[in-house]
Amino acid sequence: MDVNPTLLFLKVPAQNAISTTFPYTGDPPYSHGTGTGYTMDTVNRTHQYSERGKWTTNTETGAPQLNPIDGPLPEDNEPTGYAQTDCVLEAMAFLEKSHPGIFENSCLETMEVVQQTRVDKLTQGRQTFDWTLNRNQPAATALANTIEVFRLNGLTASESGRLIDFLKDVMESMDKEEMEIVTHFQRKRRVRDNMTKKMVTQRTIGKKKQKLNKRSYIIRALTLNTMTKDAERGKLKRRAIATPGMQIRGFVYFVETLARSICEKLEQSGLPVGGNEKKAKLANVVRKMMTNSQDTELSFTITGDNTKWNENQNPRMFLAMITYITRNQPEWFRNVLSIAPIMFSNKMARLGKGYMFESKNMKLRTQIPAEMLSGIDLRYFNDSTRKKIEKIRPLLIDGAASLSPGMMMGMFNMLSTVLGVSILNLGQKEYTKTAYWWDGLQSSDDFALIVNALNHEGIQAGVDRFYRTCKLLGINMSKKKSYINRTGTFEFTSFFYRYGFVANFSMELPSFGVSGINESADMSIGVTVIKNNMINNDLGPATAQMALQLFIKDYRYTYRCHRGDTQIQTRRSFEIKKLWDQTHSKAGLLVSDGGPNLYNIRNLHIPEVCLKWELMDKDYQGRLCNPLNPFVSHKEIESVNNAVVMPSHGPAKTMEYDAVATTHSWVPKRNRSILNTSQRGILEDEQMYQKCCNLFEKFFPSSSYRRPVGISSMVEAMVSRARIDARIDFESGRIKKEDFAEIMKICSTIEDLRRQK
């Protein structure tokens, strides 16, 4: 089905074609090798922006630290991180004046959250720096390891299950003279293989205990591991992102909860909302500025870009903001919230894996770990790397660089948005006290500024004043990358505004196509993506119909399930033809079994199994939806599943789709190669957690999910639940007396075993 692309644009206004200029087709670029170089760039740049600050030495770790706060005022347009404390505090005061009670109310909301949040909040999130093993781990494993090591050292507050109690353990751990940790190691030995009589290397994995003194422990607790950000489109160079450890995560979560609560109450904030809600918020601000610019006034909009937002922000400034925001709150609450910025102003950036060297004839490869960079002879490196290493050397301690100024990517998005909005707030006429005034939108480091004035000179003066105000707060608007237009045309967080928002369809392109989960989920996700784009992104009926046909084609090629009456030969075609011939009602076969496609743009909301159920042969229904079918390892499927789709910018988002459990909902098995590596012990731990959690969910299904209250272990909670359920089932006659007795006996046995342990 070939389509002439020009046909798509016959009736499209020029500005709607913006999406064709976006770099979103094809695969995004991924990084390979180590992120060490990118991390060194970040550390060096951050220090360069703040170079005229004051140097001090951290008393606990001995790390040199640069403090640019209240540094010299800028004399040129170069980006700097010299935020002025009094200016930040004043901006906060004005923000509160414009929104009476905003900080007070947000603090009360946050206090409630702090008291109710459970430790398992920290299991969300992907990679986390596991300080016990000195490498990245899935969040759940890293948390479990941390709690296990805390328990070894007599820190058991977290057993209450509240996050705030876990944080008490973290605080106490910092005061301990030494911490004992359990770490993994591997032994290699050469043994003779009985079968082949050859020598082979055998690896065994062990756990060993190790003691860390106070200094080493604190360094690890303050360490952020770094990785390269993958799949970033439209950039020539890669950049580093940070993965913090478990000690920092909980504190950051509470600060961000407070900041999120404030952002929700600010009309200029592009966070935490998204999608259509965000567009509505933006449209409101634009409408306000347009209606208020009377016939005599001009209105211009800057599509803004800030230079190195993260590297010029400063945790000390965030501490000042939090101190102000929480000034009338209880002492304990102020302390909890001030710890995250304090930890960040003493942070260490781990340099990653180090460098890989190859000899000229490619015979020898060797890895130089980051720990060795402080002492190695620099003649082996090329010029640019040599300069980087020389610059960073004074900051190195055990393969991590002291990085006091700057915020690593993505850490305090909400709080930095509050800072940005506080400047937009200063643009009201009553504050500018002159003929020009401004308003705008802020979402993390992205902003749009709308300036109104009587003439062009006034507009220029307004922009200049905004620019200088930003400088005082450590924000550097880029004059090269920001551009100004008559209000009505601008871009903000990749939303294009042209008298209303233009659908930027190319952004959704990466999520079209076959996801590769399994036949059942892929069909469902594919049609849901098309449905969602018809609702949200101006995907017209003709294009949607075409997208659907292309998707079905793609799906059939992926799973080799061409129609039973096709001429295409694949590995599956023999079986599919056989099924086709013996099926009475061919329309009832799923597409993945060689059936016809019954989807059109009117019925995309119906799962395929439901769409075809009435058309299926009885025996086909029986095979398709049979939980006892031996060829399928079933996971229990909720009625709604979540798929991860890749939008063009921002993190992968989850998308709900309807899931009907059939024999096509298989789950692929884990790759075996991991079982021979040092990760094996970790994998076993992970499977154990998985099993425990699954078991727990069986006892407390989400429909009746009330958290077991009080300090009871998972086992105690499950045993007591089993007893209650058994009694109810017995009394209502659902189970026999013998079954009831057996359940009670098993429960007692479990309790006895626990006591003996």
Swiss-Prot record:
Catalytic activity line of the entry: RNA(n) + a ribonucleoside 5'-triphosphate = RNA(n+1) + diphosphate
InterPro entries: RNA-dir_pol_NSvirus, RNA_pol_PB1_influenza
Annotated GO CC locations: host cell cytoplasm; host cell nucleus
GO biological process: DNA-templated transcription; symbiont-mediated suppression of host gene expression; symbiont-mediated suppression of host mRNA transcription via inhibition of RNA polymerase II activity; viral RNA genome replication; viral transcription
Region (Disordered) residue spans: 52-78
A GO molecular function held by the record: nucleotide binding
Processing after translation: Phosphorylated by host PRKCA.
Keywords, ordered alphabetically: Eukaryotic host gene expression shutoff by virus, Eukaryotic host transcription shutoff by virus, Host cytoplasm, Host gene expression shutoff by virus, Host nucleus, Host-virus interaction, Inhibition of host RNA polymerase II by virus, Nucleotide-binding, Nucleotidyltransferase, Phosphoprotein, RNA-directed RNA polymerase, Transferase, Viral RNA replication, Viral transcription
Domain of life of the source: Viruses
Short sequence motif Nuclear localization signal: positions: 187-195, 203-216
Family membership noted in the UniProt record: Belongs to the influenza viruses polymerase PB1 family.
Function: RNA-dependent RNA polymerase which is responsible for replication and transcription of virus RNA segments. The transcription of viral mRNAs occurs by a unique mechanism called cap-snatching. 5' methylated caps of cellular mRNAs are cleaved after 10-13 nucleotides by PA. In turn, these short capped RNAs are used as primers by PB1 for transcription of viral mRNAs. During virus replication, PB1 initiates RNA synthesis and copy vRNA into complementary RNA (cRNA) which in turn serves as a template for the production of more vRNAs.
Subunit-level organization: Influenza RNA polymerase is composed of three subunits: PB1, PB2 and PA. Interacts (via N-terminus) with PA (via C-terminus). Interacts (via C-terminus) with PB2 (via N-terminus); this interaction is essential for transcription initiation. Interacts (via C-terminus) with human PKP2 (via N-terminus); the interaction competitively inhibits the interaction between the RNA polymerase subunits PB1 and PB2.
Name the UniProt record assigns to this protein: RNA-directed RNA polymerase catalytic subunit
Organism of this sequence: Influenza A virus (strain A/Swine/Tennessee/26/1977 H1N1)
